[in-house]
Regions:
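Mature, soluble, non-transmembrane domains
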Residues: 59-123
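N-terminal secretory signal peptides
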Residues: 4, 8-60
C-alpha cells in the first residue's frame, strides 16, 4: 500500500505505510499532529496530539499530557479518503515520514494555495 495525494489535477504516490500530518492552528498558532496508517481498508487515524487548547481545538477528556502535548487515540474506522482544505491563514499542511517533514506544495511540485488536497490509500 502507498499514500496518494491529489491536488489541482496532480497525483503523487508516496511509498509509505505510516505518516504524520502536521498543521498550525490559524488562530492559536500552535501545532496539531496526527499519526496515520495506510491500510487496505483506507487511512487509519492512530493518534492525535496538540500543544494546547482553545478556539475549537480542545483535546478530548481521555487525552493525557505527555512532554507538553495532549495525546489521545481517536476511535474511528479507516476512511477511504481524507480531504484537506487550506485557509491560507496558518501556513501549509506538512507531511512527515522517517523524521522528515515537507509541505504539500513541495511534495506535489506546485503551490497548493487554495486547492484542496485529497489523501487516499492506493496500490
Amino acid at each position: 500500500m502507498s499514500l496518494c495525494l491529489i491536488s489541482a489535477g496532480v497525483t503523487k504516490t508516496l511509498a509509505v505505510a505510516a505518516f504524520t500530518l502536521v498543521w498550525t492552528h490559524s488562530i492559536e498558532k500552535i501545532d496539531w499532529r496526527e499519526n496515520w496508517r495506510v491500510t487496505p481498508q483506507g487511512l487509519e487515524l492512530v493518534e492525535a496530539r496538540v500543544k494546547g487548547s482553545g478556539a475549537g481545538m480542545e483535546p478530548p477528556p481521555e487525552a493525557r499530557l505527555v512532554d507538553g502535548w495532549f495525546v489521545w487515540q481517536p476511535h474511528r474506522v479507516p476512511m477511504p479518503e481524507v480531504v484537506l482544505g487550506n485557509s491560507g491563514k496558518a501556513g501549509e499542511w506538512r507531511l512527515c515520514t522517517k523524521g522528515t517533514c515537507r509541505t504539500l506544495s513541495t511534495i506535489l511540485g506546485h503551490d497548493v494555495g487554495p486547492h484542496p488536497t485529497t489523501m487516499r490509500a492506493c496500490d
